[in-house]
């Protein structure tokens, strides 16, 4: 049995910038919706990310009811991620927000695909099974980074805390059947694919991922599948979604499966592109700064001291961060125009984070008596340390002492003194020549 999964792998930005790829995306999704509505046998997996459909609906907002109807019939599989992020160059919190946003959007379409699909990330962090389990997922699907010790198509992947998910190894990649329909005799090509993959699958149906980067299914897909099944009896081809295969084809008990704990970062079977770690380092620095401002400053300070929850601003900041976390975005392996766009989005996230944090600081400072000084600790633990203050004091003060709220005097040291400006004048342009 060949379980054929029509899909595409959609890099939102990579060797071309986002808007140029979106031109092709709209054509692809238009065709998928038309074909799914015309024939209930047609199904399609949207690459494990909701961003594809969000980008599409910005151009075709009237198509959302069509998408919801096809998700309800099981013909379209959407989510659970918002973006297929790199897992090592962003923080754990960014990965959490990515999954949270993706599940939320997919459920508004009808339901999120029940598989943590990670087809093209450049290796996988050790905590991914833990994250998936916390979000209610028991299954994952991966390609890059799987070590040679895994000799079956399915294995149990565990995080350091013991959380585990049943994981489908995409043998041969997310496009192992991408060229199937380019051969003169597709039935023979299908048999060769089966023979090549059977060592990993044994008696289980073979998972054939029919799709690759920015690709669409051939127009005669259903007819060709029918012809293969009619012409020969050696094997059958069944169309389905990825979730349909992973959830409906148990391969023994979990105890019988190969086990792996920790990160998946082997290059034994696929290139994990380690060079992206040091490509366009400025993007990595900007990302870390924006993450720190949102997660460590803006949100905690707003929760503790803010007078109103700035939900839309925080949501926008995280949206810009997640949009920048794509495995061809934050990695810096795309075109120069892509890097420029990523830098702008990260800058917006940092602006929102710093602005919200400073707004809280201003609110706190406004609550203290006139002449007092407010010192705000942004850390999630008590701190003692040096505080650098700029104070305005009378010229005849020889020393300055600070009294704490409990009456104790704080040790102080004056590091410098500058005279206050006592006169200023605005010079009209016509007087500049006189100076």
Model-predicted segments: where are they?
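Glycine-centered coil/turn sites that cap beta-strands in beta-rich domains
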Residues: 385-393
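Catalytic core of carbohydrate-active enzymes
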Residues: 429
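Catalytic-domain carbohydrate-binding cleft regions of carbohydrate-active enzymes
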Residues: 1-378, 385, 397, 405-415, ...
